């Protein structure tokens, strides 16, 4: 009996240990109080209190919420047609391909095709759903092929796929990385679209690659390869080379680093493409592009190192161009302006200046490598030198000839002097530097700076300021009077009438002298009547003024007194009577037989202080 009782208890425990099947496996979900916790592939969530927790196809609640993590065929994680709640929310992360997100409170978290909420949000990563027009845009949708972003609040965050035509929000933002959607016209542009049209107002695609038109107001695509840059604010940042016709901004900027564009027109006002296209005519030039013919700026710069661009007409040439199309490049195909035509020219000139006596000229004719010419010059001696030459690749071959006869003098004849008439005849003679008539014969002779000269020898027969009739060098003339003497610097005096015969004799600076010897027979300030001396000087008397009758040079006369000695600077003293203390009168030796202050015989010896004495005085 106990065995039977134990078996009964064991069976009861087995029966009690088996769980009952859930109610929602047999009954439809409640429309009033709740939703099944783990609804299956078709249950409808409650319209009042909630939604199925993870149903695979059930319709979420229109009032209280949406399925949390559905995985099936409805609207949850993998729902394909379920409609999200219009009031309280949207599926959290469903992959539905057509479900409509809530138009009031939210949007599906990651649906792949559902239409985002028109009021509160957009699917987080939908691939084609239309983003919210009011509150947001899909967060990171991937492959949406036509969804329209929100026109009010935002744009898809990080679209990564191949959207080819969706229109971005026209109010608040643009798709983050759409590849073809049209960016917002108001607030932004796609981050990296490949062809969509950027915003005309606030921005441009960040790195579009294939041709989208950038904003004409605020920006340009960051790295587009051919899109048209903004006409107002900017240009593509760093396009990589395939834009073949995009027009950069004409106001504010140019593409930053385009590397292969072959025809885009850069900005005419503010900048130029960084690497390639036609540079700006106003502000800059491409930095270091590889363009094959772009024209650099004619105002501000030249391409940095483009291998063929035509250099600037105003500021400089390309830094190191070596390409195949620009003017000046070293490659084949460009107009490099080589001098491949033979040179051909002809010129001639002749200069004649009669007042200065200049006469010269040159003529030349060239045809290819062969040159002929002639130049001529009037030489100082009156002849004309003519050089005729030929030049070619074999060298320079001159032939020299002369015309006319050379003058006899050593210099050109002049028509007159500074202030008088000259009659000389030789080089730098028969003329004077100024405006007189010169007929003299000797070098710088026969003429004078300021008067009439008739003498024949060099710097003789003339005087600076009077009439001269003498014949010797710097004789027969005086600076300021009439001279009749025949010797060099004799027969004349600077300021009076002189009748002496020898050099610097027979004349005196300021009076009448009748002596015949050098610096004798005359005195600086008195009357000299001695024979060979005939004048008074500092010797042979006393220097106090008077008449001198000495007969030797610089003796027999004194500057200011009466001297009776005979020898030069002897037999007299500068300041006393002959015969006194310090006076020598014994042997007529110049400045000898005594000294100025004592009675010795040998004094200064047989020679004078300032000249050569041979016993006959201060002769020289």
UniProtKB/Swiss-Prot annotation:
Region: Disordered, residue numbers: 22-376, 390-620
Signal peptide: 1-17
Listed Low complexity bias regions: 310-321, 423-432, 583-595, 611-620
Protein's UniProt keywords contain Zinc-finger: no
GO BP terms in the entry: chitin-based cuticle development
Mapped Elastic repeat ranges: 42-56, 57-77, 78-97, 98-112, 113-127, 128-145, 146-164, 165-179, 180-194, 195-210, 211-225, 226-244, 245-262, 263-276, 277-292, 293-307, 308-324
InterPro entries according to UniProt: CHIT_BIND_RR_consensus (IPR031311), Insect_cuticle (IPR000618), Insect_Cuticle_Struc_Prot (IPR051217)
Biotechnology: Its strong elasticity suggests that it may be used for industrial and pharmaceutical applications. Recombinant protein can be cast into a rubber-like biomaterial by rapid photochemical cross-linking. The resilience (recovery after deformation) of cross-linked recombinant resilin exceeds that of unfilled synthetic polybutadiene, a high resilience rubber.
GO molecular function, one term: extracellular matrix constituent conferring elasticity
Gly residues composition bias: residue spans: 67-81, 90-99, 137-147, 156-166, 235-246, 255-264, 322-334, 411-422, 433-513, 523-563, 573-582, 596-610
Gene Ontology CC: one annotated term: chitin-based extracellular matrix
Chain ranges of the Chitin-binding type R&R domain: 342-415
Keywords per UniProt: Cuticle, Repeat, Signal
Protein task: Plays a central role in insect flight by providing low stiffness, high strain and efficient energy storage.
Protein name, as recorded: Pro-resilin
Gene: resilin
């Amino acid at each position: 009996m106990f065995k039977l009782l134990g078996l009964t208890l064991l069976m009861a425990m087995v029966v009690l240990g088996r769980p009952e099947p859930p109610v929602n496996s047999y009954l439809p979900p409640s429309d009033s109080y709740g939703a099944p916790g783990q609804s299956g592939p078709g249950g409808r969530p409650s319209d009042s209190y909630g939604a199925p927790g993870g149903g695979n196809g059930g319709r979420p609640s229109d009032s209280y919420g949406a399925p949390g993590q559905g995985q099936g065929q409805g609207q949850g994680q993998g729902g394909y047609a379920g409609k999200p709640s219009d009031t309280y929310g949207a599926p959290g992360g469903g992959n539905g391909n057509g479900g409509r997100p809530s138009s009031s409170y939210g949007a599906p978290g990651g649906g792949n095709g559902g239409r985002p909420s028109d009021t509160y949000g957009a699917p987080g990563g939908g691939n084609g759903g239309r983003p919210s027009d009011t509150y947001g845009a899909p967060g990171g949708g991937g492959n949406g092929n036509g969804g329209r972003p929100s026109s009010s609040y935002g744009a898809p965050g990080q679209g990564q796929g191949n959207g080819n035509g969706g229109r971005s929000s026209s109010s608040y933002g643009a798709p983050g990385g759409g590849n073809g959607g049209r960016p917002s016209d108001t607030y932004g542009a796609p981050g990296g679209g490949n062809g969509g049209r950027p915003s005309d107002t606030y921005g441009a695609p960040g790195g579009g690659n294939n041709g989208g038109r950038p904003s004409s107001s605020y920006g340009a695509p960051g790295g587009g390869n051919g899109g048209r840059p903004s006409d107002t604010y900017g240009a593509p940042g760093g396009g990589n080379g395939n834009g073949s016709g995009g027009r950069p901004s004409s106001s504010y900027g140019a593409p930053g680093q385009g590397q292969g564009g072959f025809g885009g027109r850069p900005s005419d006002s503010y900048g130029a493409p960084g690497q390639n296209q036609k540079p700006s005519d106003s502000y800059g030039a491409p930095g270091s592009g590889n363009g094959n013919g772009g024209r650099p700026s004619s105002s501000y710069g030249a391409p940095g190192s483009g291998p063929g661009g035509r250099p600037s007409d105003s500021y400089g040439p390309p830094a190191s161009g070596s390409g195949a199309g620009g003017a000046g490049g070293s490659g084949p195909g460009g107009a490099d302006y080589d001098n491949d035509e033979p040179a051909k020219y002809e010129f001639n000139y002749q200069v004649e200046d009669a007042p200065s006596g200049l006469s010269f000229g040159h003529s030349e004719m060239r045809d290819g490598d062969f040159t002929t010419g002639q130049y001529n010059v009037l030489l100082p001696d009156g002849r004309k030198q003519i050089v005729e030459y030929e030049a070619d690749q074999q060298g320079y071959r001159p032939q020299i000839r002369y015309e006319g006869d050379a003058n006899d003098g050593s210099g050109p004849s002049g028509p007159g002097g500074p202030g008088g008439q000259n009659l000389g005849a030789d080089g730098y003679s028969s003329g004077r530097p100024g405006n007189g008539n010169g007929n003299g014969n000797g070098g710088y002779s026969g003429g004078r700076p300021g008067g009439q000269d008739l003498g024949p020898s060099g710097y003789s027969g003339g005087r600076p300021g009077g009439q001269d009739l003498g014949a010797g060098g710097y004789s027969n003339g005086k600076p300021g009077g009439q001279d009749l003497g025949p010797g060099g610097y004799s027969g004349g005096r600077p300021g009076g009438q002189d009748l002496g015969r020898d050099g610097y004799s027979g004349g005196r600076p300021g009076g009448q002298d009748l002596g015949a010897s050098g610096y004798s027979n005359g005195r600086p300030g008195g009357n000299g009547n001695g024979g060979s001396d005939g004048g008074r000087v500092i010797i042979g008397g006393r220097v106090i003024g008077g008449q001198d009758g000495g007969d030797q040079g610089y003796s027999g006369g004194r500057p200011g007194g009466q001297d009776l000695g005979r020898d030069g600077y002897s037999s007299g003293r500068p300041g006393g009577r002959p015969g006194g203390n310090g006076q020598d009168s014994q042997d007529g030796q110049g400045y000898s037989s005594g000294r100025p202050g004592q009675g010795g015989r040998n004094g200064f010896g047989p020679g004078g202080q300032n000249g050569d004495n041979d016993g006959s005085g201060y002769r020289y």
